[in-house]
Regions:
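Structured alpha/beta or helical-core interaction and ligand-binding surfaces enriched in interleaved
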Residues: 151-153
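Beta/alpha (TIM)-barrel catalytic core signal, keyed to glycine-rich beta->alpha loops juxtaposed to Asp/Glu
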Residues: 1-147, 159
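Short, low-complexity polar/charged micro-motifs in intrinsically disordered terminal tails
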Residues: 155-157
Length: 160
């Protein structure tokens, strides 16, 4: 006894959230949330999870690094959403912050998010994230950047 403090699940969509909440008592969830993928925010599922006192960890904050790539380096497969990516880059530039800081600040500004999970490939990337984490950016409504096409929101669907 006492070996497990919290039980959690890693989920992908609100259908899974509904299923889990209807059948199990959990302490935390790990979910994809980023400035392009606002589905769980828009659907009210983040608020629902909080009503059940579930801790929420956001993952895919940088959408597998897509949000951090230079526009010129983004593969042509993403052409249908390049307009949205351009607006995202322009918003960061207008605010004089990096795309990393804007992407991270957006997720950190969501009241229901308790923790942010990030992945890095290098020590330099980790240092960059640590450097911008405490910086607070005044985030306005970025619903105009929200997309719903799962082909672009779920990296397992990417054809690159």
């Amino acid at each position: 006894e006492g070996f497990v403090k919290k039980i959690g699940v890693s989920l992908y969509n609100y259908g899974q959230i509904d299923c889990i909440l209807g059948n199990y008592s959990i302490d935390l969830v790990q979910l994809p949330v980023n400035i392009l993928d606002q589905r769980l925010l828009d659907s009210g599922h983040l608020k629902t999870l909080k009503k059940y006192n579930v801790e929420i960890h956001a993952r895919s904050v940088f959408l597998q690094g897509l949000l951090l790539m230079q526009i010129s380096d983004i593969p042509s497969w993403f052409n249908p959403i390049k307009g949205v990516l351009n607006v995202f880059h322009k918003e960061a530039k207008k605010r004089r912050i990096s795309t990393l800081q804007l992407a991270l600040s957006f997720v950190q500004s969501i009241d229901e998010i308790d923790k942010v999970v990030v992945g890095v490939n290098t020590l330099e990337q980790l240092h960059q994230i640590i450097e911008v984490m405490p910086l607070k950016v005044n985030i306005r409504d970025f619903s105009s950047l929200s997309i719903s096409d799962k082909n672009f929101l779920n990296p397992s669907n990417w054809r690159i």
